[in-house]
């Protein structure tokens, strides 16, 4: 675990309240003099031929200086990767991690990126971002505050394009107001405090702003600016101009924006062959990229990035073991695959780097306390029932059989090494103790048993229920089969219900599930703050109390139910957290939420998700030995792929 996680809000996050400004510090050391800027040989040839302006004219006035992981790199080469099918998110993670602000590499805080600096007022209602002067889109067009205004006025606030403003950009029902201070300064104004904006901007969600900002390009597809847009709609085979521009802008949950090679970007590489779901995707260096290394070399070091489009994950694994991938963790990051990769290191001429799951738990068991069946609802809401089932699980056996001994018993709490880790909560009710399990279950009052030894519920019938499990998660299915056996031994009849993931989600959103197993999020500090759904009823995906979570998001929803006092207390604390500017304040509130989680024990954890691995060729450099693995961190984006090099 990253030891620096305990420094959340201190290490590289230089947030000063009031008139304070976040500086770039050591991650943006003074760049070399403009006369000393260096560029890739391929770009130097284009400059000599008059096809490009000199490198000093392509860089902003104050380029972001990236400190290499190990050493100054050399130019050239192709970074080979592989993705699966037509909906893979790998491009967003590897060549698309450019933001107003970004996570620092060790995930200890937020640092500037396209924004040179930022400041926040005392109550967290006004965020001011100073953009880098002279920064340009990949086609050479200047990027200014007007681009952000286009995203705000013509994409976000256009109800045809964006029917509902995302919650992270609202104060209650009031959307953020974005205004231009000058050509290089933008303000985000909220009616009430927004303590989480910087985190969202740095996460996967934050990509949508810059994707919707190349005004000079997107205006061509916008009816307000192009009266002939219907001709483009017809040529593209789109149903409407709205659908066409939505595809151009895309969103963080879909790869649509990567299907357009003409889209200008601020990323280190720009597409030359788009992502159509067949054969290969190709990206080449962006000659206007705004970052340099400490010696003034314009980044990226690597000339070209390719993605072979594969039909399945096994094909990606085979390509890796045969040496066909230069650096990749996505689609390889499972325990079973890690064992295969380790056995073929010499054959594939690669090393392994560790990708540390950001999950709080390898498999959470959620008994739906708002289930529509009133008998099961009464049973599931009894804390002693949940405690008894937890004590009946032999987690060490599950670890040995399914995780090769690489895991350990663990409940649903943030991981060791994080600021929010709590040893007591992590280990409570994890010991395998059949006697104590039966005692807890007896305290429920369900002591009578039928002729097969199963406990009788309040309706006079056997306590029996199903638990939904994704068909794609063989490890979860196998674990649930073991747990079925453990629970039978203490008189509870549980039947695993394998179901395709989309159907499992649909049942959860409709509050139709009796129980559900899922991997547990919120294992890192930022994830606990951004994605707390397993710690309290936060949303409809809080599968242990879906109707309570719906109530928190929208009390008027017909599926919403008033939560019990303990859950309401957690929801109130989280609402306060969202309005809290300081990191210390947010952490203090989250600890209160987690203390209630520990006391009420709403979900049952099994084992901690073990570490996984990616491959990196022996001639591929500046890749950290360890990095977090989650979509919120946008792995490996914050490790600065632009400073990777091949030699």
Please annotate each region the language model reported:
Residues 70-94, 114, 197-206, 376-378, ...:
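A structural "hinge/loop" feature
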Residues 132, 255-260, 288-340, 484, ...:
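Ligand-site clamp/hinge motif
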Residues 64, 263, 269-281, 285, ...:
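Detector for C-terminal structural segments
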């Amino acid at each position: 675990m990253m030891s620096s996680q305990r420094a959340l809000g201190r290490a590289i996050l230089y947030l000063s309240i009031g008139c304070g400004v976040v500086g770039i510090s050591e991650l943006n050391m003074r760049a070399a003099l403009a006369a000393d800027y260096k560029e890739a040989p391929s770009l130097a040839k284009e400059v000599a031929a008059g096809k490009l302006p000199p490198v000093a004219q392509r860089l902003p006035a104050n380029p972001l200086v990236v400190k290499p992981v190990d050493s100054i790199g050399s130019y050239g080469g192709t970074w080979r990767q592989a993705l699966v099918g037509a909906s893979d998110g790998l491009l967003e993670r590897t060549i698309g991690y450019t933001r107003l602000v970004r996570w620092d590499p060790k995930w200890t805080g937020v640092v500037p990126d396209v924004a040179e600096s930022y400041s926040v007022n005392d109550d967290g209602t006004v965020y001011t971002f100073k953009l880098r002067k002279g920064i340009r889109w990949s086609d050479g067009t200047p990027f200014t505050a007007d681009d952000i205004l286009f995203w705000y006025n013509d994409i976000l606030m256009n109800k045809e394009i964006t029917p509902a403003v995302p919650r992270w950009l609202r104060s209650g029902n009031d959307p953020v107001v974005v205004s231009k201070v000058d050509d290089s300064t933008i303000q985000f104004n909220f009616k009430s405090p927004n303590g989480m904006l910087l985190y969202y901007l740095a996460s996967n969600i934050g990509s949508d702003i810059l994707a919707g900002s190349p005004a000079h390009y997107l205006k061509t597809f916008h009816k307000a600016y192009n009266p002939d847009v219907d001709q483009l709609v017809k040529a593209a085979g789109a149903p409407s101009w709205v659908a066409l521009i939505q595809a151009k802008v895309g969103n963080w949950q879909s790869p649509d924006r990567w299907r357009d090679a003409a889209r200008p970007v601020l990323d280190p590489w720009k597409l030359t062959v788009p992502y159509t779901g067949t054969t290969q995707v190709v990206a080449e260096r962006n000659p206007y990229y705004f970052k340099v290394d400490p010696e003034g070399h314009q980044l990226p070091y690597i000339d070209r990035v390719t993605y072979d489009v594969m039909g399945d994950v096994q094909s990606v694994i085979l390509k890796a073991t045969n040496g066909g991938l230069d650096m990749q963790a996505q689609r390889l990051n499972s325990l079973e695959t890690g064992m295969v990769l380790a056995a073929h290191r010499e054959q594939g001429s690669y090393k392994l780097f560790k990708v540390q799951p950001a999950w709080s738990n390898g498999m959470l068991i959620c008994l739906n306390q708002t289930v529509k069946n009133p008998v099961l609802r009464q049973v599931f809401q009894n804390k002693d029932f949940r405690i008894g089932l937890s004590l009946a699980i032999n987690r060490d056996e599950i670890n040995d059989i399914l995780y090769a001994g690489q895991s350990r018993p663990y409940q649903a709490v943030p991981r060791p090494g994080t600021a929010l880790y709590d040893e007591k909560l992590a280990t409570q009710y994890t010991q395998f103790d059949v006697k104590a399990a039966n005692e807890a279950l007896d305290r429920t009052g369900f002591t009578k048993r039928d002729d097969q030894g199963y406990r009788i519920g309040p309706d006079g019938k056997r306590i029996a229920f199903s638990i939904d499990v994704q068909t794609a998660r063989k490890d979860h299915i196998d674990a649930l089969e073991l747990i079925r056996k453990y629970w039978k031994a203490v008189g509870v009849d549980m039947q695993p219900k394998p179901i395709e993931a989309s159907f499992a989600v649909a049942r959860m959103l409709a509050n139709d599930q009796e129980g559900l197993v899922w991997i547990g999020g919120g294992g890192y500090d930022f994830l606990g703050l951004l994605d707390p759904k397993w710690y309290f009823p936060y949303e409809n995906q809080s599968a242990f109390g879906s109707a309570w979570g719906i109530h928190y998001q929208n009390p008027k929803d017909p599926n919403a139910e008033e939560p019990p006092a303990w859950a309401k207390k957690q929801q109130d604390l989280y609402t306060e957290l969202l309005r809290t500017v300081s990191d210390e304040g947010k952490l203090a509130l989250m600890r209160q939420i987690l203390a209630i989680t520990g006391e009420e024990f709403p979900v049952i954890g099994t084992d901690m998700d073990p570490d996984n691995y990616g491959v990196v060729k022996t001639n591929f450099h500046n890749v950290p030995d360890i990095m977090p693995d989650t979509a919120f961190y946008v792995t490996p984006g914050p490790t600065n792929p632009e400073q990777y090099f091949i030699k």
